[in-house]
């Protein structure tokens, strides 16, 4: 059916003596995805333990660190030996450079610090993990351990203005292989 319809259309165009031109667009996307992000690392939720707002009124004005891991798995053999860097991206809190901005009743009063894979260095949004060096893929999987904590802004500490209520922040991460 398709062949005969095509032949009929071709015949009609030739017999009318007109040429018809039309564009055909082709698109594609090539990815170099040597490792897959594990399902438990996609759309990850880091939940901070409930704390009294007054815990953020006095120095150091921060929560304990919550640990989390980004897991890479099913790394293709061509990935072994490559360096993978992970970069978190998100809106920074103006009063706490290098910290994520929170939304909710304490916006502008709290920020979220991300800790690098060494467990102590601040990992600023837009910078790559492991002090920019990344991590070498050495096998089929790789675990990247991070931490996060909530901290009051200097102004919120000074004025004791952190109040009870929910807060949240969102960051995305990007993986680059080289």
Curated annotation (Swiss-Prot):
Keywords: Fimbrium, Secreted, Signal. Its main location: secreted. Transmembrane segments: none annotated. It holds the Pfam family Fimbrial. Residues 1-21 form the signal peptide. GO terms for cellular component: extracellular region; pilus. It is found in: Secreted; Fimbrium. The keyword Lyase does not apply. It comes from the Bacteria. InterPro entries: Adhesion_dom_fimbrial (IPR000259), Adhesion_dom_fimbrial_sf (IPR036937), Adhesion_dom_sf (IPR008966), Bact_Fimbrial_Adh_Pro (IPR050263). One of its GO terms (biological process) is cell adhesion involved in single-species biofilm formation. Adapter that links the pilus rod to the base of the tip fibrillum. Regulates the length of the tip fibrillum and joins it to the pilus rod. Pili are polar filaments radiating from the surface of the bacterium to a length of 0.5-1.5 micrometers and numbering 100-300 per cell, and enable bacteria to colonize the epithelium of specific host organs. Strains of E.coli that cause infection of the human urinary tract produce pap-pili which are hair-like appendages consisting of about 1000 helically arranged subunits of the protein PapA. These pili mediate binding to digalactoside-containing glycolipids present on the epithelial cells which line the urinary tract. This is Fimbrial adapter PapK. It comes from Escherichia coli.
């Amino acid at each position: 059916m398709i062949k005969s319809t095509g032949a009929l259309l071709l015949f009609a165009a030739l017999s009318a003596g007109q040429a018809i031109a039309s564009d055909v667009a082709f698109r594609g996307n090539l990815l170099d995805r040597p490792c897959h992000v594990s399902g438990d690392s996609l759309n990850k939720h880091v939940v901070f333990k409930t704390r009294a707002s007054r815990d953020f009124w006095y120095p150091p004005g921060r929560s304990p660190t919550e640990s989390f891991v980004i897991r890479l798995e099913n790394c293709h053999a061509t990935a072994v030996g490559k360096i993978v860097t992970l970069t978190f991206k998100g809106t920074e809190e103006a009063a706490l450079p290098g910290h994520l901005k929170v939304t909710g009743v304490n916006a502008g009063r709290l920020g979220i610090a991300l800790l690098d894979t060494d467990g102590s260095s601040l990992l600023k949004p837009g910078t790559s993990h492991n002090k920019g060096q990344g991590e070498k893929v050495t096998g089929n999987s790789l675990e990247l351990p991070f931490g996060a904590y909530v901290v009051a802004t200097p102004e919120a500490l000074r004025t004791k203005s952190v109040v009870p209520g929910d807060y949240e922040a969102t960051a995305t991460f990007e993986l680059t292989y080289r």
